[in-house]
């Protein structure tokens, strides 16, 4: 996660370099940031961006955060479009509902940086995030090794419509499906929330009695 922050700070430093000749307090470069959630690492990202912006006269950063609400995030992005921001940074909640408004910003000539989660088109300027398909494959290999290629598993995934959850599941299944003696019993949506993941797991443990335990060394 810190890699995302460092890359975004680099973007801010470049933007700040474009306006260093501005007089103090004159806003010349506006950055709009649309966050999909307000968990701890996103708070850190927001604080680092705001702190970096303080080093440059004329740079203003406005951050709007929603709690996993697609409609509200679309409204926030449209607010930034109408405000005429010079740069838009978006961490999409779910890809499909947020794609149209991000495309609208891009079509209006606003540079768009998509962070952590992708959208369903190529209408953005840059993407800062992990290779979630490879992460899913790594998890699949780990599970296969722990079970010695034989057993039953359940998957508690992230928010169903978010691209990291989609990509990680596909990467995971690309490995597991090649193991004929490993069977996926169920897949549940944990929505990136620990409490919800625990709740889903408790329900599965009550309803499923054949979840394999890894072999201990």
Predicted regions and their residues:
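Residue-level detector of conserved catalytic or cofactor/ligand-binding positions
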Residues: 209-217
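Bacterial N-terminal signal peptides
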Residues: 8-17
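C-terminal motif of bacterial Sec signal peptides marking the signal peptidase cleavage site
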Residues: 20-21
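Hinge/beta->alpha junction and helix N-cap segments in small-molecule ligand-binding domains
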Residues: 34-46, 62-72, 94, 117, ...
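Short acidic/histidine-rich motifs immediately flanking catalytic phosphotransfer sites
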Residues: 80-87, 208-209
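Bacterial N-terminal signal peptides that target proteins for export
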Residues: 1-8
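Signal peptide-proximal N-terminal region
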Residues: 47-63, 177-182
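Flexible loop/hinge segments that line or gate small-molecule binding clefts
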Residues: 95-134, 145, 152, 158
């Amino acid at each position: 996660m810190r890699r995302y922050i460092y890359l975004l700070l680099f973007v801010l430093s470049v933007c700040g370099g474009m306006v260093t000749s501005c007089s103090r307090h004159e806003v010349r470069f506006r950055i709009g940031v649309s966050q999909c959630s307000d968990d701890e690492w996103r708070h850190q990202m927001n604080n680092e961006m705001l702190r970096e912006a303080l080093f440059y006269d004329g740079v203003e950063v406005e951050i709007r955060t929603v709690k996993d609400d697609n409609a509200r995030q679309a409204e926030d992005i449209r607010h930034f479009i109408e405000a005429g921001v010079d740069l838009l940074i978006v961490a999409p909640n779910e890809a499909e509902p947020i794609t149209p408004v991000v495309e609208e910003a891009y079509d209006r000539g606003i540079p768009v940086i998509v962070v952590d989660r992708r959208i369903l088109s190529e209408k953005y300027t840059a993407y800062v995030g992990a290779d979630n398909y490879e992460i899913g494959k790594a998890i699949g290999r780990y599970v296969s090794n722990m079970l010695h290629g034989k057993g039953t598993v359940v998957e508690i995934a992230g928010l169903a419509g978010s691209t990291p959850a989609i990509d990680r599941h596909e990467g995971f299944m690309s490995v597991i499906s090649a193991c004929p003696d490993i069977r996926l019993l169920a897949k549940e949506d944990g929505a990136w929330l620990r409490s919800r993941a625990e709740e889903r797991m408790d329900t599965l443990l009550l309803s499923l009695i054949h979840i394999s335990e890894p072999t201990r060394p």
